[in-house]
Each structure stands twice: as C-alpha cells, then as structure tokens.
Amino acid sequence: MRVTLYHNEDAGEGASVHDLTATIERHGHTVVAVVGTSDDATRILEAESDLVVASGGDGTVSTAARVLAGKATPMAILPNGTANNLARSMNITGTTDEIVAAWATGTRRPFDLGRASGPWGERWFIESVGGGLIAHSIRAFESQPPELDRPRREELIDAVRMHSEVLSSLRAVPWTMTLDGVSVSGEFLLVAVLNIPFIGPNLELCPHADPTDGEFAVVMADERHRDAIARHLQHRAAERDIGLGVTCWRARSVEIEQGDLLHIDDMVFDWPSEARVSIQIEPASLHVLV
C-alpha cells in the first residue's frame, strides 16, 4: 500500500519518523508522504495514498480523523501517546511491528464521528464533547508547565491526580439539554457526550459506548455521584480498572442550551451567555483499518 504517515514526535514515548518509516517499508508498503504537525494536517490528503497512518496520541489521531471525515481513504492508528483512548477503544494493541504486520489481513471498520456546532463554528470530533470535571481538568492541565520525556505511566498518573484535585473543589452547575427531543436538566459535576468508552487519562465513563453503532452514549453525573467519581479516579491512579457506575443515555442528537466550560475532544471553549450547542452523530464518517 501507499501510505501517508502523519506523525507527532512529541507524543508519549513514540518512535522517530525514520524508525516508523523503516518498519512500514519492511512490511512491503511505500511511505509516500510524512506530515509532522497539526498545522500541516491538511497536507494529509495531498498525496494519493491508500492509507493514512496516524502515529501519536489521541490529539494526533483526532486531527487526522477530522481531515479524513467523509473521505474514502481509511486511517490506521499507531498508538504512541499518553492515554491512547482511541486505539484502546478499537482494541489496537501490540508493538508497532505487530500492528503494521496486521494491516495485511486487517479489515476496514466504519467509525462514527460527531459534529458540534456552536459559537466557535462547526467542529468534527472523534472522542467526546462535554463539560464539568473533564473540561476544567483540561484547562488546569494546560496551565501547568510542560515536562518532556516523561514515562507514559507517570503522565497518566499525574493527569488522574489533576482530575482528583479539580473534583475536590468542583461545584455542580445547571445544565439544560435535549437528547433526541427529550428535555433533561439538572445540576451536574460532569456531562459527557461520548463516541468511545474512554476519556481523558483512560477514564472509562461508559463501557458500552460504541463508535460503530450510530449513537452517542451520554453521561450526566450529579452531586450524588461525587464519591463514585472519586473512587474511579483513585482506582485509575492505582492502575486498576473500575467502572464509574453512572447511567449511560443513548442519543443521536444532543442540544445544550445551558452549561459550563465545554471541551470538544481536547480543546476547551468558554461558554458564552445565551449560547446553544448542537451535537450530531455522523455514522460511518471514517474508516479505520484494524
């Protein structure tokens, strides 16, 4: 196959472009282009390749997915980031060599994307849209000075601890939403419109979220769930898996009329007064080689 490699060398503990290219070519493929940064992402489609390979963390994969949305060219993932939620959701595991070797017998799986429209315009997303704990934790993490060349495990644990610190002082705020025409309102600590089960530092908010079923999983956690969220974070910090235990709603369309600081994947947006956000599922907008 002719491969375009979209690679973020700053992600996690990943290999160099040279090493990745050598591995891909060793398995009989031709690397026809290498794209390095998010600013260059639109160049992904310039080369006439059979496959776009996103090598990096969830941010790198999300950027590639937005460029490929609605296009025929499939994407493969080489998970080299910190959380690797998207690869984990598609059960893409193993060494780089093992993952590349599997492409020869792999299948193209349809993958849903979401589209969020609001004061910022329209934006595709692959992981989630939400507010409360996750958005405030992303904002808090962004305020910290970057530390390079740290082991993935340390980065994950620090991110979980940051979520715990944010939760300790977080107040539930009013949200007003409509899920497939059904009105829902309340004061929530966390709201998440999920395309995949995992979010942030491998937090499994809804194990049944499926990026191939044409629906979102929607989680709304209020003050009654504070202790459950805290336990979930404690177990993640200890690298143990335990479910959040909060009801997951199903919806194809979500309208938010009142809310809090909002995140779309890993981008955070302030909530303007009287703003409305519309979130739609776009089934099979992407194809992933697994």
Where are these regions (language model features)?
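Catalytic core of DAGKc-family lipid kinases
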Residues: 4-5, 18, 27, 32-36, ...
